[in-house]
Amino acid sequence: MAEAKHAGALGAVYEAKRPEEVAALYDGWAGTYDAEMAVAGYRHPSIALALVSRHVPRGAAPLLDAGAGTGLIGEWLGIMGYPHVEALDISQGMLDQARKKGAYKAYHCLALGGSLPFADGHFAGIVSAGVFTSGHVGVEGLPELIRICRPGGVIVLTVKNTVWEGGFADEIARLERDGVVRRAEETEPYVSMPGEVGTIPSRAVVLVRN
């Protein structure tokens, strides 16, 4: 199923081909991102937060918001009882918006898909919403998130169906067979932006690091 062509900044980031292009587009979008995504009815943050609260013990620390953007998730995690959350995003402009909310203890301007400068097992939990999607990150971003999550830690991801069916589901199945992770929960497919006509459904998945 081909995704409908989206207009404006959303369409541009979905069609981006290189990480530096994605970063520049988000830098330019950062100031109006929250308002525009509210109009689109953006659901990933609320779904991811519900799964974090269900699977990550209150007080667990540190947590990583991978693809934190403007802090739509991070600003709620502190309220929910998670005292130390760090932000990672490819766009400094988006992180600057998140910093204004005081949502995180640290801000890392980095891209998923390559090596990350964190020790093995550093984080008690990781959440990544709206990142494994068109023009952003594919299954290549998963190994490092698993590496930096401690044994027993929880990884909450949202994944667009095209990415899921393009190798992500097979990789998770392989990791389960190899005993690397356990799939604790997988949602039914849902439309992440009901205000955007033609949005391909996504799903959320919760992995526990063995």
Label the predicted regions:
Residues 168-188:
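Conserved Class I S-adenosyl-L-methionine
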Residues 1-20:
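N-terminal auxiliary segments of SAM/dcSAM-dependent transferases
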Residues 42-59:
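Conserved alpha-helix/loop element of class I SAM-dependent methyltransferases that forms part
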Residues 64-66, 70-115:
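Class I SAM-dependent methyltransferase SAM/SAH-binding core
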Residues 116-126:
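A short acidic, Gly/Pro-enriched loop at the edge of an enzyme's catalytic core
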Residues 152-160:
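Conserved beta-strand signature within the Rossmann-like core of class I S-adenosyl-L-methionine
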Residues 124-138:
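A short SAM/SAH-binding and catalytic strip from SAM-dependent methyltransferases
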Residues 140-151:
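A short glycine-rich, Lys/Arg-flanked "PGG" loop and its adjoining helix->strand segment in the class I
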